[in-house]
């Protein structure tokens, strides 16, 4: 059988009933320039690009959005990639809801990445109030993708209020540490086998992305790992390849881990294979 590199495209990434060819989502902040951002998007071909709604449009904001205001949004639209607005910087339920409503009007989409921050030092999500906010957004007709922790109880509660996909972190935002609690993340995947899970925050290397895809996670969202690398365009492409490799490996069915060595070469047919103790030495 001939391997087709595109065979993972027959394994669509489905969110809220919509299929996407890519399992990578890409943030648009903190790039060296708009041109670099545009090239990174073209190199990785993400399923969506995330955008923070600005209440004021300042030129030269220091996060790569130096075109400022409407010009920046027009540039994003020319990329031909669906936009996923987020509620970054919101610390209260009312801020989230207001920002989401404004984003829906500006970007003409019901998609929203829910970010409700509980601590401005760790940027940890407000896990206590998030389910209620998510429920309100769902009732308002939004397709909610909540940024959350790997806490199983929280994730179940978010599903109970109507979220159809979750975005647990691997580590705090911008740390680039990869999965700091592999046991909890793998447990979450095992206990929610039918829920789309997108790892959001904490990934720093393409190998981190490949790892969580190998565990069965459905996708990853990246920003700092690409935007703050030495060569963002190359890193964007590297992450896209890692995501495809990780998903392909998961579908291939990795071998089980073992505590002891097991010979990969059979001893039958080898010189002295029938001698006493040969199998023990193999």
Curated annotation (Swiss-Prot):
It comes from the Bacteria. GO terms for biological process: thiamine diphosphate biosynthetic process. Pfam families: ThiG. SUPFAM superfamilies: ThiG-like. Its EC number is 2.8.1.10. It is found in: Cytoplasm. Pathway: Cofactor biosynthesis; thiamine diphosphate biosynthesis. It catalyses: [ThiS sulfur-carrier protein]-C-terminal-Gly-aminoethanethioate + 2-iminoacetate + 1-deoxy-D-xylulose 5-phosphate = [ThiS sulfur-carrier protein]-C-terminal Gly-Gly + 2-[(2R,5Z)-2-carboxy-4-methylthiazol-5(2H)-ylidene]ethyl phosphate + 2 H2O + H(+). Keywords: Cytoplasm, Schiff base, Thiamine biosynthesis, Transferase. InterPro entries: Aldolase_TIM, Thiazole_synthase_ThiG, ThiG. This is Thiazole synthase.
């Amino acid at each position: 059988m001939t391997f087709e590199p595109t065979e993972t495209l027959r394994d669509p990434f489905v969110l809220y009933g919509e299929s996407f060819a890519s399992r990578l989502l890409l943030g648009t902040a903190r790039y060296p320039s708009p041109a670099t951002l545009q090239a990174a998007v073209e190199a990785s071909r993400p399923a969506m690009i995330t955008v923070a709604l600005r209440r004021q449009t300042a030129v030269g904001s220091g996060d790569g959005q130096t075109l400022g205001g409407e010009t920046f949004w027009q540039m994003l639209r020319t990329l031909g990639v669906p936009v996923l607005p987020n509620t970054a910087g919101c610390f209260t339920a009312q801020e989230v809801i207001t920002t989401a409503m404004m984003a829906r009007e500006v970007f003409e989409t019901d998609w929203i990445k829910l970010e409700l921050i509980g601590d401005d030092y760790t940027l940890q999500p407000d896990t206590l109030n998030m389910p209620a906010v998510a429920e309100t957004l769902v009732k308002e007709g939004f397709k909610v993708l909540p940024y959350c922790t790997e806490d199983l109880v929280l994730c179940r509660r978010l599903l109970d209020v109507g979220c159809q996909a979750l975005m647990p972190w691997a580590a705090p935002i911008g740390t680039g540490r990869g999965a700091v609690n592999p046991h909890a993340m793998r447990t979450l995947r095992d206990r929610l086998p039918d829920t789309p899970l997108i790892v959001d925050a904490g990934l720093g290397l393409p190998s981190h992305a490949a790892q969580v895809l190998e565990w069965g996670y459905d996708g990853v969202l990246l920003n700092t790992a690409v935007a703050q690398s030495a060569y963002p365009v190359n890193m964007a492409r590297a992450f896209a390849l890692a995501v495809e490799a990780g998903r392909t490996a998961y579908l291939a069915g990795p071998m089980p881990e073992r505590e002891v060595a097991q010979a990969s070469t059979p001893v039958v047919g080898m010189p002295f294979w029938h001698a006493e103790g040969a199998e023990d030495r193999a």
